[in-house]
């Protein structure tokens, strides 16, 4: 169902007020809003909260910043896994924890690699690295689902956050990629024009 113009205006105002309350720079606000519009999986509030302090960054800088948030989330998850593995009551889930530990090593590396290639403006490669980070993180969820046990906190929240930041980072990287590729810009403009309602040539 298409959002009415009035409702869309209310949503836009709400986002602006929320961003202002957090002290978010206008570039961060617009980039996160564009990312959320381009990929419905993007959680706008998380994008604003995680990237809002990067006041001087353009979209390219925000894409790189998001990958570093991903590295940090992966490191925190790895530390939490070690603590869970050391617990006396986790014998039944230790194989799943071992699988998560293995996957999160790859997650951190994928985010770090994404940062490096995005910094070199190899956006397509960066998008693939972020897909890899997302896939590896989801394998931790799958390891616990296989034994029918939910992830314990705070690992569950860290995993959800890592998945979300991979989605956010890729969405922003895609925006930068499109904006820096004349052919993609032209294709996007043509697609938007094709979707726009046609005005009659008659009064």
From Swiss-Prot:
Induction: Induced by drought stress. It comes from the Eukaryota. Residues 1-26 form the signal peptide. It is found in: Secreted, Extracellular space, Apoplast. This is Pectinesterase inhibitor 12. Pectin methylesterase (PME) inhibitor that inhibits PME in vitro. PANTHER family: OS02G0537100 PROTEIN, PECTINESTERASE INHIBITOR 12. One of its GO terms (cellular component) is plasma membrane. Belongs to the PMEI family. Keywords: Apoplast, Disulfide bond, Secreted, Signal. The keyword Signal applies. InterPro entries: Invertase/methylesterase_inhib, Pectinesterase_inhib_dom. One of its GO terms (molecular function) is pectinesterase inhibitor activity. Disulfide bonds join 32-47, 100-140. The keyword Nucleus does not apply.
């Amino acid at each position: 169902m298409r959002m009415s113009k009035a409702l869309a205006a209310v949503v836009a105002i709400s986002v602006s007020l929320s961003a202002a309350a957090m002290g978010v720079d206008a570039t961060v606000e617009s980039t996160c809003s564009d990312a959320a519009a381009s990929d419905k999986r993007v959680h706008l509030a998380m994008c604003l909260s995680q990237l809002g302090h990067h006041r001087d960054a353009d979209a390219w800088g925000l894409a790189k910043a998001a990958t570093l948030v991903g590295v940090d989330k992966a490191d925190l998850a790895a530390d939490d896994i070690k603590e869970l593995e050391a617990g006396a009551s986790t014998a039944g889930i230790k194989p799943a924890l071992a699988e998560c530990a293995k996957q999160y090593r790859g997650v951190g590396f994928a985010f770090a690699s994404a940062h490096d290639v995005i910094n070199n403006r190899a956006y397509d490669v960066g998008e693939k690295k972020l897909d890899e980070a997302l896939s590896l993180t989801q394998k931790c969820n799958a390891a616990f689902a296989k034994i029918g046990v939910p992830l314990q906190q705070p690992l569950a929240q860290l995993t959800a956050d890592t998945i979300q930041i991979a989605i956010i980072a890729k969405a922003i990287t895609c925006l930068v990629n499109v904006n820096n590729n004349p052919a993609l810009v032209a294709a996007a403009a043509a697609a938007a024009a094709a979707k726009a309602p046609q005005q009659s040539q008659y009064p």
